[in-house]
Amino acid sequence: MTQLIAGVDEVGRGPLVGDVVTAAVILDPAKPIAGLADSKKISEKKRLALFDIIMQNALAVCVGRASPQEIDELNILHATMLAMKRAVQGLATQPTFVRVDGNRCPNWDYASEAVVKGDSLFAEISAASIIAKVTRDAEMSELHNAHPEYGFAQHKGYPTKAHLEKLAELGPLSQYRMSFKPVQLSLMQRGGQLAGN
């Protein structure tokens, strides 16, 4: 029997806002995809093109996520592991083996290995990194459209100087991760009031 190998990667552990997004992808060995690489090392235009190619040609793709509330409750590491579990369990075709980018695998029953810099080494992890990044970036663009004053389209929720200044000025929205230090600080300075309240 052919091994069905799923690649798993996450995006969005560092941002102050939004879900942590993971993707699991099983590529079709009969349909190799040229140009797969770590999503951080390719242009947005190429990422979007590869996203469509992966969605059309992969044997199975699933996005798993953990919400800001789950991140606050569990911590970012455990929330990321939960999101990865959701991504793999949601695959329409279940894998015989799972490769996870990073240095640890979730606690699950799948045969698996963690691969540091796996998004540069294995096509299935590269594909997962592209699916996760494009998905999360699109969500940040939607949040930007709803709240352009925060500049989410530029910083994608990461704690840049410009973002921290806007957070201090405007306060956190309900989509922020309240357990993250800069968000806690902003909330304290506002007497616990979210933006718009």
Swiss-Prot record:
Q: What keywords is this UniProt entry annotated with?
A: Cytoplasm, Endonuclease, Hydrolase, Manganese, Metal-binding, Nuclease
User: From its record, what is one biological process in GO terms?
Assistant: DNA replication, removal of RNA primer
Name the source's superkingdom: Bacteria
Task: Give the coiled coil ranges.
Answer: none
Spell out the Pfam families in the cross-references: RNase_HII (PF01351)
Question: Cofactor comment in the record?
Answer: Manganese or magnesium. Binds 1 divalent metal ion per monomer in the absence of substrate. May bind a second metal ion after substrate binding.
Where can this protein be found?
Cytoplasm
**Homology family:** Belongs to the RNase HII family.
Annotated protein name in UniProt: Ribonuclease HII
Instruction: List the gene name.
Output: rnhB
